[in-house]
Amino acid sequence: MSNSIIKPHGGKLCSPMLNKKHLREVNNDILQLKSWTLTDRQLCDIELILNGGFSPLDGFMNQDDYNSVCEKNRLKNNLLWPIPITLDISNSFADKLDTNEKIVLRDKEGFAIALLTVSDLWHPEKDKEAHHIYETMDTNHPGVNFLLNDTHSTYIGG
C-alpha cells in the first residue's frame, strides 16, 4: 500500500488560513468591520473551505461559479463540482455591503472565524437551484426543504 497522498480535487490544495503575521495585522481591523454570524451549516462550510476540504475553492462561490454549478455541475473553469457552496445572508445585511468590502464571519459565540472580501451579491433563483441540483421540488427532500425554507434570499461570494 502506498503512503502517498492523493492530489486534491482540481490539482491544488487551497487552505486560506491566516498565518500568525497576517493575523496580527488584521486583528485590530476585525473590531471595525461589519460581521455576519454564521449558522451551523455555514460554519461547517467555512471550516471545509479553510482546511482545504473544498479545494480548489478558496472562498464561498461567486455568482458565475454558482450559475455554472447549477446549470452544468461544473465550476466556471469546467472542473466537476456537484453542489453550490454559498453563503446566504439577510437582505438587511446585504443592503449594508459593498463589493470589495471586508467582513468578519463569526461563530455563535462571537469569535472571528474568517475574513471575507465581498466579490458579489445576488438573489438566487432557489426554485431553479433546487430543480437543477436535487432534480426535485419536493420539500420532503431535506436539501430542497432546507434551501427553500431555511436559507436567506441573498447570496454573497468571496
Name the predicted role of every residue range.
Residues 1-158:
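Non-catalytic terminal extensions that flank enzyme cores
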